[in-house]
Swiss-Prot record:
UniProt keyword annotation of Disulfide bond present: yes
Tissue specificity comment: Expressed by the skin glands.
Primary localisation category: secreted
Family: Belongs to the frog skin active peptide (FSAP) family. Brevinin subfamily.
A Pfam short name: FSAP_sig_propep
Propeptide segment residues: 23-43
Keyword annotations: Amphibian defense peptide, Antibiotic, Antimicrobial, Cleavage on pair of basic residues, Cytolysis, Disulfide bond, Fungicide, Hemolysis, Secreted, Signal
The name this protein goes by in its record: Brevinin-1CG2
Keyword Phosphoprotein: no
Length: 69
């Protein structure tokens, strides 16, 4: 009976270690993905502000350069 328990315990132990390593790798991938998503969110918030400022000041700058206001 003990001879059959020993391999089963070994398989259980190795499986537990394998699952632990997979979980750590998955968590690391999620953290990297979260950083990428935060960068995209910052870009989405930053670009409309820049576009709005450009839309306000570009006609004024063109008007002053060409002096056709």
């Amino acid at each position: 009976m003990f001879t059959t328990k020993k391999p089963l315990l070994l398989l259980f132990f190795l499986g537990t270690i394998n699952l632990s390593l997979c979980e750590q790798e998955r968590n690391a991938e999620e953290e990297r993905r979260d950083d990428d998503e935060m960068d995209v969110e910052v870009e989405k918030r930053f670009l409309p502000i820049v576009a709005g400022l450009a839309a306000n000041f570009l006609p004024k700058i063109v008007c002053k350069i060409t002096k056709k206001c």
